[in-house]
Amino acid sequence: GSCRMSQRGAPSTSPIIPSLSPSSGGNPSPRSSQRIDSVRVPARLPGGSDHPEYGLPLSPRSLRPYLSRGPGAFCAPPWRPDVNRLAGDVNRLFRGISTSSIHVTEDSRVLRRVLLDFYAMGYTHARPTLECWQALLQLMPEQSLPLRATLRAINSEDKYEQRFLDPPSKPPKTLFGEECEVSGDESPSEEEEASGNSTISEFSPEEESASSDFESFSDEEDDSCCTGKWSSSESDSEADVPTNPPTTRARAAQKRRGRPVPKGGRPAKSARR
């Protein structure tokens, strides 16, 4: 009978070894639901010289231990798109954000942005180097072996036919992305909080001793001097206006009211009250 030859450059797998690769389109393959520990190394991996993105070719023997355990055991050649699996994986991440994140809305936006960024990088041929892949996915060199083998297998295909994928045929029953849209969850991020706190001026005893005008307050003065409110008059913009924010002035007034009267001195009106 006729013998059907495999496509040039495509990795061939043993017929008795299941594959981690999902089927094309929206319908998952029965093999795609198998556990990762049942995945085995393809019988032949694409050859070729050293490449900036996935490095030197890997032998099946060196790749085998990393396909079933460790942080890098999330992919294996050959790869095919599976919309159902992708929708389920993204929904699991939304579930983690909705149940444990402090900034739910912000983190859900980050997840959507990451998905778009990786698609856009591939579409625009902005290909990460091997070191960049390891930094982005936080993988050690030995943990990135399955990723390297998968990328080499993808790039060994002669060409890919452009097509549009349909929505998942089996979407998750509970969409946790909808639960991430929490009203009022627009709190600033940690970076914004850190930058905002740097502008707050704290009162210190040195500032109090250096400001002699704090000791000359009386009831005849304007209330704005004691309440810490800024005045719009031009006279206040000169010597009477403190160099620190108004909250510092209010704290100084509170501390001054609780001080004991010096010996031989006459207490102020505010202290006598």
Curated annotation (Swiss-Prot):
Top-rank lineage group of the source organism: Viruses
Protein keywords: Early protein
Record has tRNA processing as a keyword: no
Low complexity bias spans: 11-33, 261-273
Region ranges (Disordered): 1-57, 160-273
A single GO BP: regulation of gene expression
Compositionally biased intervals (Acidic residues): 178-194, 204-224
UniProt entry tagged with the keyword ATP-binding: no
InterPro entries the UniProt entry points to: IE68
Family in the record: Belongs to the herpesviridae ICP22 family.
The protein's name: Transcriptional regulator ICP22 homolog
Species: Equine herpesvirus 4 (strain 1942) (EHV-4)
